[in-house]
Amino acid sequence: MTFKFVDLFAGIGGFHAALGAMGGHCVYASEIDKDAARVYQRNWGLKPDGDITLAANDVTMDVPPHDVLVGGFPCQPFSKSGKQMGMEETRGTLFWNIAKIVEVHKPQIVLLENVQNIVGPRHIHEWQVIIHTLRQLGYRVSEKPLVVSPHLIRPEFGGRPQVRNRVFIAATLIPKGKRDINADVDVPNLESVMMGWDPQKWNLEKDLPLDKLKSKSEKSAVALNETEISWIEAWNEFVEIMRERLGENNLPGFPIWADDWVHTKDLNISYDTPDWKANFLRKNAEFYTAHKTVLDRWLKKWNHLQDFPPSRRKLEWQAQNEKNLWSTVMHFRPSGIRAKRATYLPALVAITQTSIVGKQKRRISTREASRLQGLPDWFDFVDQSDSLTYKQLGNGVNVGAVYNVIRAQVIRDLDLLGEESALVKSILGAPSNPDLVLGAHSKFHELAQEQARKDEEEYLPLRIVK
């Protein structure tokens, strides 16, 4: 049993990995970034189309028929005409092109992914229009957002030690005889793959896992430079001093701003200072006043941190009772050096804030970052730079999250899809963990590429002319 899917805004293929592991084969992919498209083609044997606005519009429909449509689309503002919300209100945005494909082909399942801001106050209008449009097109979809992060999914179901909260829009075609486009429904239920799991049980070193790098080239690619090491050494000494001084008590949870350390009697906060900042300034003054002698000694040793850039004269301690800085996972952020326990990592992002593994005194490698997204170790990033690979991974979707969301969507909508359909049998008949399929490199890889070649030979684009 198998099904056909299209992969829009495909990136390097996180959606493809998840749906391919469920037995699906991709009949069309679209990715405008040439570097990401090259990685996609290398791994999946299918060359993505470029600009989706040229492939799906009022005149042309180059996207072939399919059962499932997936995509991590950009969130763009819609017009606010004051009229009835609907598909026309989305015209000029990439969601309109998605809706056009859905209108023409009526795939049984539509699964879209976006950042959490799409359900925030700034985008409430866009969210409402998206839900309304999908319902007008004949789909069951919840107006409540489904927010999923891989670190909340049990490892045996494809979870990963990465906080990556993403919103999924799970829409299922309603057969005409059952159609009630205004009926609300709950979001797909992922409780069975999250139940009983404590994210604090993640062990980054074992569960990712972290590699033991051997070659000089591997080590140099992720090594910290001397300046970065000096920043960490200075703040590590601070942590150890305060650990000895505070005993069993944790270090302060508020941001430590060394530039703003003054005695409480000398504290002067201007009237226009935001409340949150004034609060931190007061707490830093109280902290400095309570520990002035040891802090002055530490500052003197490190030249009052004058050799450090302003953002490195700040520490955000979120590592609870860890003994020192080198036992944590760190990030160099504009707001300071952030330290967390080595359980799970913050979200990979498309900018250079790569996680630093304190125990190994290095950044995570591109292969380790790839594992965070659920991609298998055979995944090939061709000959591109590491910075480009980190960027692509930061823009990507987590395989395990997609895999479990679409399975939960099918279970929620069995009454619409039918238990005997090939789509349902393929998805529900797949292993509970995508790693079990993706790990079998040769068989999975060869089947995916063989199917892509067949589809390319057989498919002739459908042209719509008005």
Report residues per predicted region:
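Class I S-adenosyl-L-methionine
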Residues: 58-66, 81-329
